[in-house]
C-alpha cells in the first residue's frame, strides 16, 4: 500500500485489487485519494481451510483477476497497462503475460527471505533440501558467498507441523518460483547497505526501501484504524521517557504473556504506549484486558491502543525504547527512526 500511494502521488492511477476478506477493512481504515480505485475479488476460502485455501489461490484467483482486467480494459477509459504483483502471487505475473501487460513483482520480505524463495530449485540441486522441502542436513547454508548463514527457519513452509499441509505449501512455493521468474524484476522493501551480498548476487532483486518513499498525501491502508490519541498522549510526555510495545498485525500473546508484560512495565516505572489489537481482546482475554486497561488509566503512566501509526510514534521525541516482535516492517521502521535492533533479532 505504501508503494501504491507513492506511485499515486507521482501521477499514476492505481487499481488496487484485494481479496473480499480484507477489502472492507482496508477501505474503512483510511482514505486513499481520487487516483485510487479499490476493487476486491473473492479470496475463495478462509485461512482455516488449509490446503483448500492454497488451491483457491492457485487455481481460482488467476481467472478472477484475468476477467477483471479484461472487463476494466473493455469498459473503462483508465485502462490497466502495468501490473505489480505480490511476490507470493506469481500466477498474477503469468496473467499479465497472457494479457500483454508489463509486470514486476513486489516483496515486503527482507531480500534474504526473498532470495530463499527464489532458490528452491538450487537448494534441491545442491542437497540442502529434499524433494518435499525438508532439510537434508542441520548445517547452515549461504545463499551467496558473503551472505549471512541461514537455516531451515527461513523456509516459509517448514513451520507447518502437518506434513500434508507442509508439502502442499512447498509445492505452491515451487510453482511460484517458476511463475514469478517471468517478471522483469522484483522490487523489495529493503536497501542496498542492509543486505548488499544478496543484491550483488541476485541482480533481479531491486531494493526500493525502506518504505514509505517520501511523504504521501494519504495514509497507507491497514486492517485497523489508527487511534490518533496516541500522538496526543505522547505530546504530553517528556523526551526519551516512553517504552513503545507493538507486536505486528498477526502475532498474538496469550494471557500469561500479557500478564508478564504488564508486570514488567509496572515494575519498570516507565511510561509506556502499548498496542493490543482488537482481535487479541476477544474471548477469554476480554475481561483481563479491560481490567488491565482500567488499572493503567488510573495510574496515568501508560496508554493502551488498538492500533496506531507506528512511523509517527517511532519518530516522536518521547520514545525511548521499542519492544517488537521483530517482523521485517517493524525492523525497518525502527532503523529509519534510530531504534536499532539488538544482536540477532533479524538475520
Placement of each model-derived feature along the sequence:
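Glycosyltransferase specificity loop/lid
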Residues: 1-347
Amino acid at each position: 500500500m505504501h508503494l501504491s500511494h507513492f506511485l499515486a502521488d507521482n501521477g499514476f492511477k492505481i487499481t488496487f485489487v484485494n481479496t473480499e476478506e480484507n477489502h472492507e477493512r482496508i477501505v474503512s481504515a483510511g482514505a486513499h485519494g481520487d487516483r485510487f480505485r479499490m476493487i476486491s475479488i473473492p479470496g475463495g476460502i478462509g485461512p482455516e481451510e488449509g490446503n483448500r485455501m492454497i488451491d483457491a489461490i492457485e487455481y481460482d484467483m488467476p481467472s478472477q483477476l484475468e476477467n477483471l482486467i479484461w472487463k476494466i480494459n473493455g469498459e473503462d477509459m483508465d485502462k490497466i497497462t502495468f501490473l505489480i504483483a505480490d511476490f507470493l502471487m506469481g500466477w498474477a505475473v503469468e496473467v499479465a503475460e497472457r494479457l500483454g501487460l508489463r509486470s514486476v513483482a513486489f516483496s515486503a520480505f527482507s531480500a534474504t527471505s526473498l532470495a530463499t524463495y527464489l532458490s528452491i530449485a538450487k537448494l534441491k540441486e545442491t542437497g540442502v533440501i529434499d524433494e518435499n522441502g525438508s532439510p537434508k542436513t542441520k548445517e547452515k547454508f549461504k545463499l551467496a558467498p558473503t551472505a549471512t548463514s541461514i537455516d531451515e527457519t527461513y523456509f516459509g513452509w517448514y513451520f507447518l507441523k502437518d506434513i500434508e499441509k507442509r508439502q502442499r505449501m512447498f509445492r505452491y512455493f515451487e510453482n511460484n518460483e517458476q511463475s514469478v521468474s517471468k517478471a522483469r524484476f522484483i522490487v523489495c522493501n529493503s536497501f542496498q547497505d542492509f543486505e548488499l551480498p544478496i543484491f550483488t548476487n541476485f541482480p533481479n532483486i531491486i531494493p526500493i526501501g525502506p518504505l514509505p518513499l517520501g511523504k504521501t498525501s494519504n495514509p497507507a491502508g491497514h486492517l485497523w484504524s489508527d487511534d490518533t490519541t496516541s500522538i496526543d498522549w505522547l505530546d504530553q510526555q517528556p523526551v526519551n521517557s516512553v517504552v513503545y510495545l507493538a507486536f505486528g498485525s498477526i502475532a498474538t500473546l496469550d494471557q500469561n504473556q500479557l500478564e508478564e508484560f504488564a508486570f514488567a512495565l509496572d515494575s519498570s516505572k516507565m511510561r509506556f504506549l502499548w498496542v493490543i489489537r482488537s482481535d487479541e481482546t476477544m474471548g477469554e482475554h476480554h475481561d483481563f484486558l479491560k481490567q488491565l486497561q482500567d488499572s493503567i488509566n488510573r495510574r496515568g503512566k501508560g496508554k493502551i491502543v488498538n492500533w496506531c501509526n507506528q512511523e509517527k510514534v517511532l519518530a516522536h521525541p518521547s520514545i525511548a525504547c521499542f519492544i517488537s516482535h521483530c517482523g521485517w516492517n517493524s525492523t525497518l521502521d525502527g532503523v529509519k527512526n534510530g531504534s536499532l535492533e539488538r544482536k540477532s533479532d533479524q538475520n
